[in-house]
């Protein structure tokens, strides 16, 4: 593999290479717990999503139990890892932020920030990084600087320590990630488009939108979304806010949970990798009983368990509303953002009819594409499509800035 380790000379921080190895006693404990922990009986409810079904659940558990951790660590370390100190501009806390990166040596490379969802990790994007290195085997040909951070409190990134209310979690994380990009030399006024492009999915969209709306350093937004959003908006008879709310309601945790209930759930999740699998697996909406996507979901769960990410991040995840109906409508209609900040959306049909049935995006947004498939596992299951969409969207962004 070519070297993608040339950190731009404009970087203000001092990222250092990061290595890790999971201790054998912890690996043995993980395997032992998986062997001893039974699966529960199938729930009588017919509302379970695909990844909550016992067969899917059992397959994922068995994959984790049989992991060859020498091979898995080799996969995780296939791309350069870094840590860097980032000072939170509110409160002054110095955080260690972990990220995986592919740095281009092209003077025209555009920085792209890939944000994982609250139930996932940087591992989610390893498939995309593989596609980038296969398509662009030389660092001088790579059109992007690709930055994949671990959110504060996840995996190898330290958590925010200051008191914050639930509504501020996305805003706090966005502030830290924007400062990371500025420290790497990708802030406003830098070469190319004068900043960076942010990409996310359904459950990280609010954070992406916050970056695009609040920070001049973020110059454009791209997201993978469920075709249900577009389908609902175009069939709602004009009452788009209520229509979008009905879609989002399926993704939101109950709002009436009190702190005691959240703490109990947090405790339950943190006691077993099987409990963690139930939480994370249910969010991927996967119907695959085997395959690469299932294996990557199992690896994400095991990685969280090995790094004690839960309970660090689990309480946050249960408090986050993915996005308000009003904000989602703003993204789809490209309102609330500066006119020169393009928005690109890749819609996935996900049971809403064929991709061709999803009409073009609402007037005002800059770019859209339509695909068959599941947006929650698109970066795992269809990484080539996501890379292709990013390339197409960013080329258009570059034209607007040329």
UniProtKB/Swiss-Prot annotation:
InterPro entries according to UniProt: AB_hydrolase_fold, Epoxide_hydro_N
Pfam families: EHN
Domain of life per record: Eukaryota
Molecular-function annotations in GO: epoxide hydrolase activity
UniProt pathway: Mycotoxin biosynthesis
UniProt signal peptide: none
Keywords: Hydrolase, Virulence
Biological-process GO terms, alphabetical: epoxide metabolic process
E.C. code: 3.-.-.-
SUPFAM superfamilies assigned: alpha/beta-Hydrolases (SSF53474)
PANTHER family on file: EPOXIDE HYDROLASE 1-RELATED, HYDROLASE, PUTATIVE (AFU_ORTHOLOGUE AFUA_3G08960)-RELATED
Anything else known: Gene clusters encoding host-selective toxins (HSTs) are localized on conditionally dispensable chromosomes (CDCs), also called supernumerary chromosomes, where they are present in multiple copies. The CDCs are not essential for saprophytic growth but controls host-selective pathogenicity.
Family designation: Belongs to the peptidase S33 family.
Record's function text: Putative epoxide hydrolase; part of the gene clusters that mediate the biosynthesis of the host-selective toxins (HSTs) AF-toxins responsible for Alternaria black spot of strawberry disease by the strawberry pathotype. AF-toxin I and III are valine derivatives of 2,3-dyhydroxy-isovaleric acid and 2-hydroxy-isovaleric acid respectively, while AF II is an isoleucine derivative of 2-hydroxy-valeric acid. These derivatives are bound to a 9,10-epoxy-8-hydroxy-9-methyl-decatrienoic acid (EDA) moiety.
The protein's name in its UniProt record: Putative epoxide hydrolase AFT8
Species whose genome carries this gene: Alternaria alternata (Alternaria rot fungus)
Gene behind this protein: AFT8
